[in-house]
Amino acid sequence: MHDFTYYAQILISGLTIGSLYALIAIGYTMVYGILRLINFAHGDMFMVAGFIMIYITSWSSSFLGAGSIAVGLILTLILTVVLGVMIEKVAYKPLRQAPRMSDMISAIGVSYLMQNLATYDTGGLAQAYPNIPWLRKEIALGSITVKRLAILTPLLTILLVVALVLIIKHTKMGMAMRAVAKDFDTAQLMGIRIDRVISITFVIGSLLAAVGSILYFSYIGQVSPTIGSMPGLKSFVAAVFGGIGSVPGAVIGSYIIGICETFIKSNQDISIFSNAFTFALLIVILLIKPNGLFGEKLKEKV
């Protein structure tokens, strides 16, 4: 019989993993809400952000010392955003008038391109992620001892989600995003700068992926060329579970998956099924509620 401390540790771990999934899932759901595109390259953006951090800190540590971590954090955020916007301009924008399948194939192509470039550069080997000492320190919460990272991750995620919701609900750009998500063609006819809205959507999604990358790889300690695939897929499932196109839905779906997955992993008899559970959940949700928990039914134009 397990005690309270055992279940509390699992719950905290589940909230941490769920928060990391949420930061990625928001990128999926925002891009889909605006472009009706499943950006399958998003998980690999997360992976690339990890390698950016590794390379920048390695390059700058010889002349900046401990300051290389701060420089690495800032440049990782900036360069990941730049990469995200470049991918949209090169791989997605030229295909806006093409059949929807073309966008999806392009996204899959970008995903494999990033994985193969990373594999070529690293030889397919995992690279150690820079140690951020402040995040690794442990703190006591009553009878429970956890790393600061486990407390910071959910708090930072909630703060970022609240800020994002406020931007979407109460700013001119947020209003433009909602208009484009509601009716792309009408928004364009009304004079809304579609390209600007789409670019900002990719900026937000890429920025959140970079933040998630920093937290996730600080948590597991290493980056490999294919490591973005599974978190990316699980975050996509979370977005569908909550109702793709809904930011709150993506967050709630992420926490449900993160907590359930952690409980399954904690049981040695069924831990091998932790990944299978996520995708089984997707099948069940699509059968029972195809639009997810908070998704709206969309009418396709013909």
Model-derived regions, located:
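Membrane-interfacial amphipathic/re-entrant helices at transmembrane-helix boundaries
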Residues: 1-24, 52, 63-71, 98-102, ...
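Membrane-embedded helix boundary and interhelical linker motif in transport proteins
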Residues: 12, 34-37, 41-86, 90, ...
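Helix-loop-helix "hairpin" substructures at the membrane interface of multi-pass membrane proteins
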Residues: 17, 145-223, 247-252
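Transmembrane alpha-helical segments in multi-pass inner-membrane proteins
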Residues: 23, 68-77, 202-209, 219-280
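Short, non-helical or kinked segments that cap or interrupt transmembrane helices
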Residues: 28-51, 97-102, 173-176, 194, ...
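Short loop segments and helix-boundary regions at transmembrane helix junctions
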Residues: 33-41, 82-125, 167-174, 179, ...
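Alpha-helical transmembrane segments within multi-pass membrane transporters and channels
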Residues: 63-110, 252-257, 289
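Transmembrane helix-bundle core of multi-pass membrane transporters
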Residues: 94-95, 100-170, 197-200, 263-276, ...
